[in-house]
Amino acid sequence: MQLAQMLIPMVSAFAITIMFMPLFIGYMRYKKEGQVIREEGPSWHEKKSGTPTMGGLIFIAAIIVSAIWVGIWQHQLTLSVWVSLFILVLYGLLGFYDDFEKLVHHRNEGLKAWQKLAGQILGAIIFLIAYFHEGFDHTLWVPIIGNVSAAWFYVLFVIVWLVGFSNAVNLTDGLDGLVAGQTTISFGTYAIIAAHDGRTDVLIVCLVTIGAMLGFLMFNHKPAQIFMGDLGSLALGGMLAVVAILLHREWSLLLIGIIYVTETASVILQVGSFKLTGKRIFLMSPIHHHFEMKGWSEWQIDLTFWLVGLIGSGIYLAFFL
């Protein structure tokens, strides 16, 4: 795709998002359906209670519609596009049920952990079936060991990657605008990689996601008019992992997704430390809440985390593209 043509997928998803998001916000306000804030979160987040949620429903629709018509236009409606959208939808449905339970029963807990995990693993397995059907390379370089070509090892790795990063993005979604901005950076980086590698089909998926996220950010920046909900964050995290795998740059997520990795690591360290020593490492986890407790504003945290994400992406592009 030429540079001018790359703008079309982004504009399409952006336009659909900004066109329908205000209508959805209005509908959710009319129905008086809003986010239930976790009791263990920062006390000042209570003022966000009642803010419309499930905004992911609109930008997921924008991504799907734009990816399909652009794929048809560019003759790039490949299996890679379909499996990316499949994971987006399936993980989105898991999040939808989670969000729906929270709204209906007015509590901040939806699906049980094992139910969500089972759905995520099922999605990863279906993705793998399509992946192997297409004959994609399943050789994976592993530090110290070297190249591992065993199919069973790659299967386990992909399941961990999809489940891990969908949950990591979900954990990161705790501040206004944070995930919308960070995923724009992440998918933007993969768009550069896809263009470099000649993967126009994956490039289209990245471009429409960038457009949708920029559109959503207009309503999600502080003070947020709407949240994406688990519906949005689980879907984005799952598809982000799929894109990295389709480009056969699996390990790139450790740098390009450094914020998601850090957020998840902070939770693991916090829980582990408390169980082992009875002491907490951070004032609150995930780590973005730690900085809130230190007195940082949401904008300061957003901008700092986005900068770190940009640096991580820049390092990957500079040394590994």
Curated annotation (Swiss-Prot):
It catalyses: UDP-N-acetyl-alpha-D-muramoyl-L-alanyl-gamma-D-glutamyl-L-lysyl-D-alanyl-D-alanine + di-trans,octa-cis-undecaprenyl phosphate = Mur2Ac(oyl-L-Ala-gamma-D-Glu-L-Lys-D-Ala-D-Ala)-di-trans,octa-cis-undecaprenyl diphosphate + UMP. GO terms for cellular component: plasma membrane. The chain crosses the membrane at residues 6-26, 53-73, 77-97, 121-141, 144-164, 175-195, 200-220, 226-246, 251-271, 301-321. Pathway: Cell wall biogenesis; peptidoglycan biosynthesis. It is found in: Cell membrane. One of its GO terms (biological process) is peptidoglycan biosynthetic process. Its EC number is 2.7.8.13. Keywords: Cell cycle, Cell division, Cell membrane, Cell shape, Cell wall biogenesis/degradation, Magnesium, Membrane, Metal-binding, Peptidoglycan synthesis, Transferase, Transmembrane, Transmembrane helix. It is a multi-pass membrane protein. It holds the Pfam family MraY_sig1. GO terms for molecular function: metal ion binding; phospho-N-acetylmuramoyl-pentapeptide-transferase activity. It comes from the Bacteria. InterPro entries: Glycosyl_transferase_4, PNAcMuramoyl-5peptid_Trfase, PNAcMuramoyl-5peptid_Trfase_CS. Its cofactor is Mg(2+). The keyword Manganese does not apply. HAMAP family: MraY. Belongs to the glycosyltransferase 4 family. MraY subfamily. Catalyzes the initial step of the lipid cycle reactions in the biosynthesis of the cell wall peptidoglycan: transfers peptidoglycan precursor phospho-MurNAc-pentapeptide from UDP-MurNAc-pentapeptide onto the lipid carrier undecaprenyl phosphate, yielding undecaprenyl-pyrophosphoryl-MurNAc-pentapeptide, known as lipid I. This is Phospho-N-acetylmuramoyl-pentapeptide-transferase. It comes from Lacticaseibacillus paracasei (strain ATCC 334 / BCRC 17002 / CCUG 31169 / CIP 107868 / KCTC 3260 / NRRL B-441). The gene is mraY.
